[in-house]
Amino acid sequence: MKTVLLPLKIKDTESISWTKGLITYLKRSYGSSQWSVFYDGDKTAEIDSCRTTANSDLAPESLLDQNYKYAAILEQIYLRLGAHSGSLQMDFTWYEAEYHSRLSEKKFKQHTVVFEKSSVMYNIGVLLSQIAKKKMSDNYKSAIPYLSKAMACFDYMSNNFLNSPSIDCAAENTSFLSTLLHAEAQEMFLMTLINGPDASKRASLISKLAHTALNLYEKCQEFYEDSSTATFGTTPYGEDKWKDIITLKVHLYRAISTYNHLRVLEEAKKIGEAIAYGKLAVHEIKEAGFYKVYVKDEIDLTGLKAVIEEKLKSLIKDNDFIYNDLIPADVSIESIKTMDAVKPVTWEEQLKVYLEQVVDLCNGAFKGIVPMEVYENESIYSEEKASLLRKEVEETDTADWEYQSFIEFTDLPKLIKDLESRYVHGGNGSSDDPQYEIMKQKITTWSKVVQDSNFKDVRAQMQNILDKRNEILTILSSVSPDQRENALKIKNSLVQASQSDDKIFASINPCLEEVNLLANHQLLWSIMSKFQIRNDEPSLLDLDDSKNQQILDRLHNIKHNQEILRLLKEERTRNLKDFKESLNNDDITQKLILLTGKPKKEMRVIFEEELTKFKPLSTRIEATIFKQNNLINDIKIKLDEVFKLIGVQDKTPEQENTVKERQTFFDKVEKAFNQFVIFSTDLPKGLNFYDTLLKMTRELSHASTPGQSVNLIDSNTLPPNLPQKSTQSTTLTKSFANLNLCNDVNDSVTQSPANLANTNNTGVNPGPPQLPPKPLSTGISGLVSDQKLQNGPTSFYNNPSVFDENLYSKFSK
């Protein structure tokens, strides 16, 4: 498959003389007698030569190198003059790129270096695009770096040159070009995959990449549709054919994305959805055909259309005769994920090497233009301001954290509200036990969860699993010898499942008493009620109502202080914001220019004096922190007084013991509930696993009857073999009953067929001799197997490859 890149055109310019401009500037700055001290004729001539070469007729690669070098020189002069580059009084004249004949003589003239820099950057982006177009003919992949650099170049222009008089350098147009080159770079990456080997195996990746390319070209399409600069019958920017080519690519890559998504759905056996996306792909490729007039020789839409229609026809036929899958009436490409494969190289990174190359040249040519010392001092001063800001931000964040922690720890708003509602009408709470009420609410919730659970009877679940194991072993004992290998593999899975069960029940067994208690509402509350602290003596508050008023007065004071704390936090936030704005708006460049040549020691003193202007704001922030600490301490003292008045701290030794016992009981119940939640979550996985294993066992038994056959289970689909120790005399049924087959994979034992077949302890049927021990799992597979059993009790059940997924279909053959 082939594609095309939109052709970008170079801007032309008129010649200028940096020699003349610098001489004029230096004479005006230093006088007719001193200007030559700051002038270097050779290096200035080299700059003129560089600009001339950058706008010559050399090959794109050579022009690109010269334009990068000239852009670095412009960056150096801009660092020295900044917004005052117009003081050079040089006329920079640039023509518009000739995308239309009416633009051939259109030109703009400005004095600023910024205008010169933006025009040079435009040409760099165009040259990168032209080189990419040449590289594309040999290898699509080799064009991607050039397009990604061009994309970053135009993106930088759209964000930094906002008021350019040139149409080419206008922010909206450079933003469009950045998006266009981004789309083309994504397109090159996509073409590399489509034309590469095994494209069918990368259908999912291709659909995502094509979706991203589609989105980018849609943005370009919106530029033509929504641009306010467009006039009737013309396009807002570029050649007239660009709009049709972009529209074609929108439909083309929507078709490619949906077609490859069709192939993904086909692999997943979602035939109905695949057909729906196939119809969408056919529609889009037909729509693309209406815009092929400019690319009919480069892009083969007819061949792609035939491929899509043939695939759709095949899927419809298969669905009619085999799958009978429901075809959705409507599907959207938005359900296909996107993937951006382009990593742009920023403009700063592109220019970094060239900036280093022209340092000596610019230091000689521009030594009379605001020395770099000014920028060095400004950088040092900026770091001083940054250090001051970091200090204030750190102190503010710490104070905010202390405030938030105090409010959350004490739950102050709710505490004040509850205490006020208790005492506002002259009531008292001396006989209340708030801690007991909180515990009661939590235990009530836990008890309801346990009572509503289908797994609250843990021992019954243990017996249920044991019954399923025995049934499986009973069936396996009767399979024919030719199915012995399949039976052993199922038994191996059964042994590993028992190890997971052992871990599940081992976590819940120590808490059975508390779990049973949560399941028994009447017994639970008969025990819990013993821990309630009751005060049968007359309340002192009933005898002295003045304490109620004392409590309310202190609560009012606490509430007032809480509001002040909130206001202090808001004020601190405002002060910090003002502090940041003050730092950002501070500019001492002019002062530094006047202080050029001062020793570093003197500059340090000057910096410290300048920083004192921020002291008032810093002091206001520190004041809010100081007041906050005092208020928090005052609130703590008032809370202690309130608790003493309501008798919270006046407990008898017997009551203290009751509180400790209650807390111990609560902790046990809480631990039991948490273990039960884990148990009730993990156990269903095990039950589902046993049901599946039982179904397989029954089908294996059916396959053992005459006239039936079954293929061997692929050993690669089973987990690693378990290591084996010496044979134990106890039967597997007894081990299952005790739920203690093994505690770790490395200590597990593979039972002999005879022992596995026995479902009671009579030992009447000795069975055939034991199989030899299997080797330990080694290497990566063994390690992964061990880790899975250690990480979670039910990790074994989550393994989809415990047994062959196609075994059921084999049994039915």
Curated annotation (Swiss-Prot):
Keyword Manganese: no
GO CC terms, sorted: endosome
UniProt xrefs under Pfam families: ALIX_LYPXL_bnd, BRO1
Location of the protein in the cell: Cytoplasm; Endosome
Superkingdom of this protein's organism: Eukaryota
Domain BRO1, chain residue ranges per copy: 4-403
A single GO BP: protein transport to vacuole involved in ubiquitin-dependent protein catabolic process via the multivesicular body sorting pathway
Organismal lineage: Eukaryota, Fungi, Dikarya, Ascomycota, Saccharomycotina
Compositionally skewed regions (Polar residues) per UniProt: 704-719
Biased composition annotated in UniProt, kind: Pro residues: 766-775
Function: Involved in concentration and sorting of cargo proteins of the multivesicular body (MVB) for incorporation into intralumenal vesicles.
Keyword terms, alphabetized: Coiled coil, Cytoplasm, Endosome, Protein transport, Transport
Presence of the UniProt keyword Transport in the record: yes
Name by which UniProt lists this protein: Vacuolar protein-sorting protein BRO1
Xref: SMART domains: BRO1 (SM01041)
Family under the similarity heading: Belongs to the BRO1 family.
Region (Disordered): 704-729, 752-781
